[in-house]
């Protein structure tokens, strides 16, 4: 979408103050000038960005499976089903982060990768983006979880994942988005441009 043609909707920052600076997140309160000329306040969180990987695996019978994780998420107080994901380290590019997160969290490395797109999960109050990658040609290896990271890795069929999405078992926004991508890739409606991995 060409942003230039929607200039009549753009808000302009006139002042900014930092409310909180943590190890991961920074919170700001900005004063903005609205398209009408009036002034409003916007509070938001600055996030370094993240990646999510949709790892594709074939079982012994050649049937497609996806690699998923179960992880406790403190803010919602629940164990969630998710695709492997993680935040960007300073100066790290998205593809390198995708490779690292897949290897660290699941132990898998992949011989082929495809970039699907970018997700902005919290547009009303965060700068966070999530780069979406598909991986195939998986090779098993050793996991290397971050200190304080606890998660289970398991596989499911795409049909099982879609059933869980429909039933409300999967409620994580990025995983729901990935399930939409997966469904369209499998059906042939959306194509991926695969490249050899490192």
Describe the predicted segments one by one.
Residues 13-14, 115:
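Residue-level detector of beta-propeller blades
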Residues 15-54:
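Acidic, metal-coordinating catalytic segment for phosphate/diphosphate chemistry
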Residues 182-195:
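Short helix-capping/linker segments at secondary-structure and domain boundaries
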């Amino acid at each position: 979408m060409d942003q230039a043609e929607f200039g009549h909707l753009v808000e302009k920052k006139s002042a900014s103050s930092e409310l909180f600076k943590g190890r991961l997140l920074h919170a700001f309160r900005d004063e903005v000038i609205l398209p009408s000329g009036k002034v409003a306040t916007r509070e938001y969180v600055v996030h370094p960005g993240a990646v999510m990987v949709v790892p594709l695996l074939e079982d012994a019978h050649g049937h497609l499976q996806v690699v998923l994780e179960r992880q406790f998420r403190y803010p919602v107080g629940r164990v969630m089903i998710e695709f492997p994901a993680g935040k960007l380290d300073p100066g790290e590019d998205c593809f390198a982060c995708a490779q690292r997160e897949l290897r660290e969290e699941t132990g898998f490395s992949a011989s082929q990768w495809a970039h699907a797109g970018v997700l902005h999960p919290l547009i009303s109050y965060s700068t966070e983006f999530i780069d979406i990658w598909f991986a195939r040609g998986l090779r098993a290896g050793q996991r290397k979880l971050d200190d304080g990271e606890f998660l289970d890795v398991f596989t499911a069929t795409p049909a099982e994942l879609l059933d869980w999405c429909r039933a409300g078992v999967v409620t994580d926004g990025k995983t729901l988005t990935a399930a939409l991508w997966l469904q369209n890739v499998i059906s042939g409606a959306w194509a991926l441009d695969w490249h050899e991995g490192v």
